[in-house]
A protein has these predicted regions:
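Intrinsically disordered regions, especially transient/low-confidence alpha-helical propensity segments
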Residues: 34-35, 44, 72
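N-terminal strand-loop-strand
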Residues: 1-39, 67, 99
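Short, charge-rich amphipathic segments
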Residues: 28-32, 76, 80-81
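Unchanged
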Residues: 44-69, 77-107
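Residue-level detector of high-confidence beta-strand sites
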Residues: 24, 73-76
Length: 107
């Protein structure tokens, strides 16, 4: 049986000063046969958490990139996906942000 989790989420389109977009290469940790994918950083929002604050927190947790200038929410969407044995129904708030760039190797 698959559980459904419905949650608000905040995500970030992160651009460096050269206009490059930062993407995360992801895979499902419990389904090795599922194809991998590229995504923008982000995740679930805390109770009463502002979407900009949540986007910045998730960006830092997932990438560790310093000195980020967070911009406004530029898009709102509803998504559904399966990940790690759960079915997610997510209300996403997409923010834009900028960083100085550089070579990053988040783990």
């Amino acid at each position: 049986m698959t559980f459904t989790l419905r949650r608000p989420a905040a995500r970030v389109v992160l651009l460096d000063r050269a206009g490059r977009i930062f993407l995360i290469h992801a895979e499902d940790p419990i389904d090795p046969h599922k194809p991998d994918w590229w995504e923008i950083p982000g995740g679930g929002m805390g109770w009463n958490e502002d979407s900009g604050a949540a986007a910045l927190r998730e960006l830092h947790e997932e990438t560790g990139i310093p000195n980020v200038e967070m911009g406004p929410c530029v898009w709102v969407q509803q998504t559904e996906y399966d990940f790690a044995g759960y079915h997610f129904e997510s209300d996403d708030r997409i923010h834009v942000a900028w960083c100085d760039g550089g070579d990053y190797d988040p783990q």
